[in-house]
């Protein structure tokens, strides 16, 4: 059993094919790069004598099999100050060649890329890598040659996420990384997040000019990053064309804004040819796809369980012709995975969104792809795979939510991850507007609440000042955050631009005269009720807290017609809202 649970198949960082080739060539003892790294780069860049000698000795072996640590190395808390201590680090120069080497995080990205395209193979038992036949052919191909490009296109054709991107672009639309990201991978979990494009564009339209570059370049979910990187590779191979996409955004009390998103893509004629071949819809044989157990979940707490469940679903489909969903459920149960049908449907949707062609006809599912053999690690020898409480909760919600899109179940995980604050606030605001039917705006940023929503056409139209918090251990509403909300409530009451020049309260139309405040998080603990009561006494405004689970359940009831926004208004009683 391996000591680490690696994640492969999804790449966010590297984009230069010339650097990818250098990484592959360190596995080819006859390449110039191998000798350069062994004889020049490592002796020059690796300052620790013991590590330097070990790496050179490893590269002198007859059979070049490198461990993950030998390739990627280690890091420090300050990434820019980490010393060079691994083969890939020494193989690629950093941007601007200031240090002469890259860090371990970037090295991991290049390793994943080489593995994703099938140039190297992972040996699970020893946590190591070896070059493949196609990797050796790529290493030996002349730089910039037709053969090199042919090898790259063949490799990308067997990489499911690349084919997924081409499939989404197939009808000729000009799609942004957000359009692509929301339909890529296993939406509904924190490893595959996508920012709501409409809310991002609205934020751009209302942002200060100095902040727009930061929003365009750095505001994205993990799936958006994957889409951006894959789109960049496809662009370099001539399979898609990248070009900015422009939008006209209405803004309150101002002329319409023209905004753009830089990372947007359209398929080319060459791309359509590659896609037709991948689908087996030409005279050529369908290109086999490489799928790895390690790509079937990324950031989940119980990713071993979920990866294995999804891998087994794929194996069941490989062995069968056409199966009903209930038959897949029965087969899974025999293998020790007792799952509701909605979870299996969600997994199959994720496999499709990963780039695997599965045909759905009514209740029948049929795999249309040729999948190369892949390994499901036997990790249950000492540890039985059991669903976590979180996975049980998600499974329960998939069964309950008939009207709410299941992609929003990801809020359950996102709300527990403090690094995902921005995604949480944007997704929550999108949910309030798309599912509940509130009007409003995502605000965020300095001296603004996360969002402002309001009703139109209710018996009593009301507005809500919204603050969201992603917190791992439950949110106790500390006094600092309560004081911040007090400030927003009072700013909305006085509406004095000398106190806050950004005038965020202009979101609310003059017809809205009753206001509430709301905190949204994963779950609440501690003395939050006392803070809500204190805020109510100071501001004479009623508020509440709302867990993301209750947010989802309330949305389901709204869509089912069993709850109205007026009934939601009456639940603001300075406590926790439960539906």
From Swiss-Prot:
Adding the endonuclease domain C-terminal to different DNA recognition domains from other enzymes allows generation of novel restriction enzymes that are used to genetically engineer eukaryotic cells. One of its GO terms (biological process) is DNA restriction-modification system. Pfam families: FokI_cleav_dom, FokI_D1, FokI_D3, FokI_dom_2. The keyword Transport does not apply. One of its GO terms (molecular function) is DNA binding. Its EC number is 3.1.21.4. Coiled coil: none annotated. It catalyses: Endonucleolytic cleavage of DNA to give specific double-stranded fragments with terminal 5'-phosphates. The keyword Nuclease applies. InterPro entries: FokI_cleavage_dom (IPR015334), FokI_D1 (IPR004234), FokI_D2 (IPR004233), FokI_D3 (IPR031655), FokI_dom_1_2 (IPR044945), Restrct_endonuc-II-like (IPR011335), WH-like_DNA-bd_sf (IPR036388), WH_DNA-bd_sf (IPR036390). It is an enzyme of class 3 (hydrolase). Its cofactor is Mg(2+). The active site is at residues 450, 467, 469. Keywords: DNA-binding, Endonuclease, Hydrolase, Magnesium, Nuclease, Restriction system. It comes from the Bacteria. Has an N-terminal DNA recognition domain (approximately residues 1-292) joined to an endonuclease domain (residues 389-583) by a flexible linker. Monomer, in which form it can cleave DNA. Homodimer when bound to DNA. This is Type II restriction enzyme FokI. The gene is fokIR.
């Amino acid at each position: 059993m391996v000591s680490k649970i690696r994640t492969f198949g999804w790449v966010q960082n590297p984009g230069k094919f010339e650097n990818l080739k250098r990484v592959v060539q360190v596995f080819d003892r006859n390449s110039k790069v191998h000798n350069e790294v062994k004889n020049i780069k490592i002796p020059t860049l690796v300052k620790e004598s013991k590590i330097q000698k070990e790496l050179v000795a490893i590269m002198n072996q007859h059979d070049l099999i490198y461990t993950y640590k030998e390739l990627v190395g280690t890091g420090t808390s300050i990434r820019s100050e980490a010393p060079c201590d691994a083969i890939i680090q020494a193989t690629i120069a950093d941007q601007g060649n200031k240090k002469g080497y890259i860090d371990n995080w970037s090295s991991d990205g290049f390793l994943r890329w080489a593995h994703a395209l099938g140039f190297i193979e992972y040996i699970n038992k020893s946590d190591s890598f070896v070059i493949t036949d196609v990797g050796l052919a790529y290493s030996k191909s002349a730089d910039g040659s037709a053969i090199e490009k042919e090898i790259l296109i063949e490799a990308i054709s067997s990489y499911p996420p690349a084919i997924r991107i081409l499939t989404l672009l197939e009808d000729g639309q000009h799609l942004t990384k957000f359009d692509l990201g929301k339909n890529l991978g296993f939406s509904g979990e924190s490893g595959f997040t996508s920012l709501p494009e409409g809310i991002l564009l609205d934020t751009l339209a209302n942002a200060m000019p100095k902040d727009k570059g930061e929003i365009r370049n750095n505001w994205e979910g993990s799936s958006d990053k994957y889409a951006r990187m894959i789109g960049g590779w496809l662009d370099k191979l001539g399979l898609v064309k990248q070009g900015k996409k422009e939008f006209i955004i209405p803004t309150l009390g101002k002329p319409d804004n023209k905004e753009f998103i830089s990372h947007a893509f359209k398929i080319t004629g060459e791309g359509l040819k590659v896609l037709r071949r991948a689908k087996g819809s030409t005279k050529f044989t369908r290109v086999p796809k490489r799928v790895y157990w390690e790509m079937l979940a990324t950031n989940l707490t119980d990713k071993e369980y979920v990866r294995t469940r999804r891998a087994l679903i794929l194996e069941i489909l490989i062995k069968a012709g056409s199966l009903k969903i209930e038959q897949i459920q029965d087969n899974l149960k025999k293998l020790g995975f007792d799952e509701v049908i909605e979870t299996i449907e969600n997994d199959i949707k994720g496999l499709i969104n990963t780039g695997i062609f599965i045909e759905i006809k009514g209740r029948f599912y049929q795999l249309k792809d040729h999948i190369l053999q892949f390994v499901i690690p036997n990790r249950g020898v000492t540890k039985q795979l059991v669903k976590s409480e979180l996975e049980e909760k998600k499974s329960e919600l998939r069964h309950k939510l008939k009207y709410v899109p299941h992609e929003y179940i990801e809020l359950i995980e996102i709300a527990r991850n403090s690094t995902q604050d921005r995604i949480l606030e944007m997704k929550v605001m999108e949910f309030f507007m798309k599912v509940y039917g509130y009007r409003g705006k995502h605000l965020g940023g300095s001296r603004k609440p996360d969002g402002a929503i309001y009703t139109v056409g209710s018996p009593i139209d009301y507005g809500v000042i919204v603050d969201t918090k992603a917190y791992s251990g439950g949110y106790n509403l500390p006094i600092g955050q309560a004081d911040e909300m007090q400030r927003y409530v009072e700013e909305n009451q006085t509406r004095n631009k000398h106190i806050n020049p950004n005038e965020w309260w202009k979101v609310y139309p003059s017809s809205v005269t009753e206001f509430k405040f709301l905190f949204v998080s994963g779950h609440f603990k501690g003395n939050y009720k006392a803070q809500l009561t204190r805020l109510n006494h100071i501001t004479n405004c009623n508020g509440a807290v709302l867990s993301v689970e209750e947010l989802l359940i309330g949305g389901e009831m709204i869509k089912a017609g069993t709850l109205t926004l007026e009934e939601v208004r009456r639940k603001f009683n300075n406590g926790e809202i439960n539906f």
